[in-house]
Amino acid sequence: MTTVIDGKDVAASVIETVKTATSTLERETGVRAGLAVVIVGDDPASHTYVSAKSRMAKECGFLSVQHTLPEETSQEELAALVAQLNADAAIHGILVQLPLPKHLRSEPIIQSILPEKDVDGLHVVNAGKLATGDLEGGLVSCTPAGAMVFVRRTYGDDLSGLSAVVIGRSNLFGKPMGALLLAANATVTTAHSRTKNLPEVCRNADILVAAVGRPEMVKADWVKPGAMVIDVGINRVPAPERGEGKTKLVGDVAFKECAELASVITPVPGGVGPMTIAMLMANTIIAAHRKAGRRPPKF
């Protein structure tokens, strides 16, 4: 019987851990976790995301600060705000919502956030710590961190003897996911658009992770019977069966056929997606614990 992971359920349990850790930290040390979210311009999708993040931060008991800047904000003005938040002792996590308006360069802004406050896990120092296996000192990008919660809850902390294949080599997901699996002692293959015999490579995987942005690319004959399949793709495709001009969300995995072979599989939507905001909250409470000299909770 295949287990279909309910990402909302797992995310809710992560949030419960965050809430408990937040109240304990404040009670025992007087430190209240603080998250600052910065948004520039009026992109509706970005505003929806930011509202959800700010709402969740409040629900967790954090000090939740939102800075909404006008579209015409200059590079210097945005950099000055980040510098101000870096210096603010009440703020443990800083998130600059991407994408920024076209006239702004996001990379210098992201790299100007103090690594210990970089709760998105995008700073090169955090990427470097992960690449060198330092999971205790850095902050991990939220989506791969969330996918790893699924892996740990399925296989435990030690993946010795298990083969993992990650399709996709992006800095945002593929590379950090591979590094996390490797740190847990899996034997990891990073596959991508130039990989030869991709279905054959995937058939060796006990843990198969797809993150390439190609709708339903992974078919049943790519899946080893009994494997765990994690689908990180979010693709909007036409859905004529729902009416003219209608669309639906699908992942990078042909869910129905692969679910017949996999032992554990994540759906799209409702799988990895809900974990992203949950792990942002987890990173914030981890950062607050470190700042207070306390051992952070495990997720």
UniProtKB/Swiss-Prot annotation:
<dbReference type="GO" id="GO:0005829">
    <property type="term" value="C:cytosol"/>
</dbReference>
<comment type="function">
    <text>Catalyzes the oxidation of 5,10-methylenetetrahydrofolate to 5,10-methenyltetrahydrofolate and then the hydrolysis of 5,10-methenyltetrahydrofolate to 10-formyltetrahydrofolate.</text>
</comment>
<comment type="subunit">
    <text>Homodimer.</text>
</comment>
<keyword id="KW-0511">Multifunctional enzyme</keyword>
<dbReference type="InterPro" id="IPR020630">
    <property type="entry name" value="THF_DH/CycHdrlase_cat_dom"/>
</dbReference>
<keyword id="KW-0521">NADP</keyword>
<dbReference type="Pfam" id="PF02882">
    <property type="entry name" value="THF_DHG_CYH_C"/>
</dbReference>
<keyword id="KW-0554">One-carbon metabolism</keyword>
<feature type="binding site">
    <location>
        <position position="193"/>
    </location>
    <ligand>
        <name>NADP(+)</name>
    </ligand>
</feature>
<dbReference type="GO" id="GO:0000105">
    <property type="term" value="P:L-histidine biosynthetic process"/>
</dbReference>
<dbReference type="Pfam" id="PF00763">
    <property type="entry name" value="THF_DHG_CYH"/>
</dbReference>
<dbReference type="InterPro" id="IPR020867">
    <property type="entry name" value="THF_DH/CycHdrlase_CS"/>
</dbReference>
<dbReference type="InterPro" id="IPR000672">
    <property type="entry name" value="THF_DH/CycHdrlase"/>
</dbReference>
<dbReference type="InterPro" id="IPR046346">
    <property type="entry name" value="Aminoacid_DH-like_N_sf"/>
</dbReference>
<feature type="binding site">
    <location>
        <begin position="168"/>
        <end position="170"/>
    </location>
    <ligand>
        <name>NADP(+)</name>
    </ligand>
</feature>
<keyword id="KW-0560">Oxidoreductase</keyword>
<dbReference type="InterPro" id="IPR020631">
    <property type="entry name" value="THF_DH/CycHdrlase_NAD-bd_dom"/>
</dbReference>
<keyword id="KW-0028">Amino-acid biosynthesis</keyword>
<dbReference type="GO" id="GO:0006164">
    <property type="term" value="P:purine nucleotide biosynthetic process"/>
</dbReference>
<dbReference type="GO" id="GO:0004488">
    <property type="term" value="F:methylenetetrahydrofolate dehydrogenase (NADP+) activity"/>
</dbReference>
<keyword id="KW-0486">Methionine biosynthesis</keyword>
<feature type="binding site">
    <location>
        <position position="234"/>
    </location>
    <ligand>
        <name>NADP(+)</name>
    </ligand>
</feature>
<comment type="pathway">
    <text>One-carbon metabolism; tetrahydrofolate interconversion.</text>
</comment>
<dbReference type="GO" id="GO:0009086">
    <property type="term" value="P:methionine biosynthetic process"/>
</dbReference>
<keyword id="KW-0368">Histidine biosynthesis</keyword>
<keyword id="KW-0378">Hydrolase</keyword>
<dbReference type="GO" id="GO:0035999">
    <property type="term" value="P:tetrahydrofolate interconversion"/>
</dbReference>
<keyword id="KW-0658">Purine biosynthesis</keyword>
<comment type="similarity">
    <text>Belongs to the tetrahydrofolate dehydrogenase/cyclohydrolase family.</text>
</comment>
<dbReference type="GO" id="GO:0004477">
    <property type="term" value="F:methenyltetrahydrofolate cyclohydrolase activity"/>
</dbReference>
<protein>
    <recommendedName>
        <fullName>Bifunctional protein FolD 1</fullName>
        <ecNumber>1.5.1.5</ecNumber>
        <ecNumber>3.5.4.9</ecNumber>
    </recommendedName>
</protein>
<dbReference type="InterPro" id="IPR036291">
    <property type="entry name" value="NAD(P)-bd_dom_sf"/>
</dbReference>
